[in-house]
Amino acid sequence: MTVSNNGMAMPSVPPKIDCSEAIQDSPKFRATVAQHAMYFNRLENRLNEMLRHITAMIDFSKNYTNTFYKLTVSVNQLCDESFSGNPLASTTFQGLSEAYAHTVNLFRTYFDHSNVVTFTKLSNFIKIELTKVAESRAHFENMSQSMDDALVKNASISRQKPADATEGRNALTAVGTCFAHTTLDYVANINIAHAHKDHMILDALWTLVRESSAFFSKGHATFDEWTAADNGAIADTIQTFAAKSKLIERKMQDVHSLVPKEMFQHPSGMPIEPDVMMEGYLYKRSSNAFKTWNRRWFQIKDKQLLYSHRSTDLEPATIMEENLRICLVRPAPSNIDRIGCFELVTPTRIHLLQADSESLCQDWMRALQRTILALHEGDSVDVASTSPRNKTTSMSSGVTLTSANAISPLSNAMDVTKGRSVSDPASTYTSANTSSISTAAGFSSSTTAFEQVRRVPGNEVCADCGSPAPKWVSINLGVVLCIECSGAHRSLGVQTSKVRSLCMDSIDNELRDVLLALGNRQVNEIFLAHLPPADSIVPPQINEKSARPAREAWIKAKYVERRFAVAEDTRARSSATNRQEHLKHKTSIGGNSSSNGVNRSSSYADVQDAESGGLLDADPWSADLSVPVPTASKRLSACGSDTNLDAIGSSSIDTKTVEWDSVKEACECGDLLALMTAYAQGFDLNALHNGTTALHIATRNGQTAAVEFLLLNGAKINMLDEKLNTPLHLAAKEGHTLPVCQLLKRGADSNLANVDSKTPLDIAMECTHADIVTLFRVTIMRNDFNADFNNPMDETVEAVISDIARRAATEKEQKKTESLKSTSDI
């Protein structure tokens, strides 16, 4: 065995083939033939690499020296990999390699010498010798298959058919004879190739050295001098490396002094990573029924608590708690009969951890408490740096977070250190901000997302007033806002603008893709496409010093009335049309009030308007997502519901001005700018066209960002197409795991059946999409245990769903990277 430059073990020259083994077609013969095939493939690859280098020497004369160096490296690799079994050839190759390397140093002015002879000889060896071996191998494999077929046919002939037996025996004899000759031809070509290999390749390489030496008489003299002086220089180098190796050996003898005198009593040194506050092994009690203790590697990194398995695979760390700001640390209760235990308490669960000693337990508790303190001190700085008019910070759920409430978890943690314990985590946070509970966001990941979103063109200032360094975002509009404008957006209601904090709220991958695809500059180009001259804008544009009423008036005109998204004459015509349609619609509703209430023939139904209940603002994986809906409301018209009447009353834009074809194409390719343009011009995202909706198309094509955009902007999650398929049906059919996760975590009904009486679970099982089937089953399992507030099943289900979603996102990213790489290669 030899070792190549990349550290991989390479097989040496295969053993010679015994002809008797070849006639018998024994397993040993097959194995030896396979080794020779691999050997010649490797040899051909290396020779082709050398030919490419020689061609480069011819074509790029100015880079001759560098290309010659690459050829030298290739010769070294060829010697190590293919000629280690032949000492004479190996020695000769080493001498040639040294000559090539010396040529690089001496002939800096050497341009475009004739390398045709060398190239021709090596090419002839590949085209003649190696091609014969390849053709013989192909004939051998074909005859081997024919031989196997003849043997099977002969073995299956009945004794009762002597004629067939004779015919089969004759055929077997003929095929066997032909196979034997083909095998021997193959062996002969292999042996001939090995015989010609040494002298042909050596002769080709020596030709280049000989011609170079003849062309440069001075170089020939230099070669003689170099040969005489070479041994001493190499010996000195070896002695230098030997001295360095002995020094390293002596240093390695002192490594045992690093072992501490008291193991498992104190943290083992400072963390290597600068952003890691503390790290080490802890035991974590699982939440399953067995309550097993598992040893995991924990880190307090980027103000998050992470843990990972001890394995040879470098897997990404799992985030135990993304937002330590809403957590507290306390010693374990007295009923835990294990030393060094402590608890990390969140509003919804309790993590029980164990250190290797009581001193390490105290170190971990202090480190976590310092992290929580740093988080709250950071919040205090943010609140102090805001405008004096905004003494309280309004969170995503609409609850006002005062500075006292922000410190309440920390105060509880401080009480624990003084000996006062908290028995119920839920009661501990009764007075805390409820939005912090639903915002279990990763501080590190939010910071990363914050930086990514801020790098989008236009996001360095507020989208509405131009204030610098905005820290809030309207997730459905895709614009970044200052804190004053975010308050005005929040007053519009979540049906118009859903405001989140870039620093404190969770931004998952799909939402991040939406924000990165839009941005202030492009969204303003859409909503301000028909902005009149500055002196005739009503209401006037705002700036960072504008008062709250002016902000509200401008933002309402921009996003609710969409006054500047379409031309003024178009808005005037569409306003009259909409008033007529509104009156007709009210008349039709009044006339049909005595009937069943909804005309099924107009369009297909939305089964459950989950978004109207505020599910988009709740914890996506909370256990209480299911909203009971009366039977009579399960067939609401997609285009004739009360929500559409409100939209007609509030917007004076004709939805017919937006072409369905452009929306369909945008959903198929994930063009969020086109979708935002259609939405700004009044397109009804729940409208049914040709028996389908925009959400159905985006889901069917696996466009997760488009699905996220549509759901954020009011697309009904359980909408039915002409075959009574919900988007969940289509995602399960196409095997799109991420859209299934998106729909399930927003409360999509997985029990609805289409015209074929099949639920999404039935379709996923038919199409054998294992991950999607698992998602449906664990969701059903979670719903079965929904009555228990802190049952261990919730954590297990969340872990399974998160793992599947993470794996699907990773696979999607890998496929995208491979596609881009293949495109660039083409």
Swiss-Prot record:
| Arf-GAP domain location | 447-572
Task: Give the classification, highest ranks.
Answer: Eukaryota, Metazoa, Ecdysozoa, Nematoda, Chromadorea
Q: Where are the zinc fingers (C4-type)?
A: 462-485
Q: Which InterPro entries match?
A: ACAP1/2/3-like (IPR045258), AH/BAR_dom_sf (IPR027267), Ankyrin_rpt (IPR002110), Ankyrin_rpt-contain_sf (IPR036770), ARFGAP/RecO (IPR037278), ArfGAP_dom (IPR001164), ArfGAP_dom_sf (IPR038508), BAR_dom (IPR004148)
What is said about the domains? The PH domain binds phosphatidylinositol phosphate (PIP), phosphatidylinositol 4,5-bisphosphate (PIP2) and phosphatidylinositol 3,4,5-trisphosphate (PIP3), and to a lesser extent phosphatidic acid and cardiolipin.
Protein name per the record = Arf-GAP with ANK repeat and PH domain-containing protein cnt-1
Q: How does it sit in the membrane?
A: Peripheral membrane protein
Biased composition, class Low complexity, residue ranges: 588-603
Site for Cleavage, residues: 382-383, 609-610
Listed GO CC annotations: basolateral plasma membrane; cytoplasm; cytoplasmic side of apical plasma membrane; cytoplasmic side of plasma membrane; early endosome membrane; recycling endosome membrane
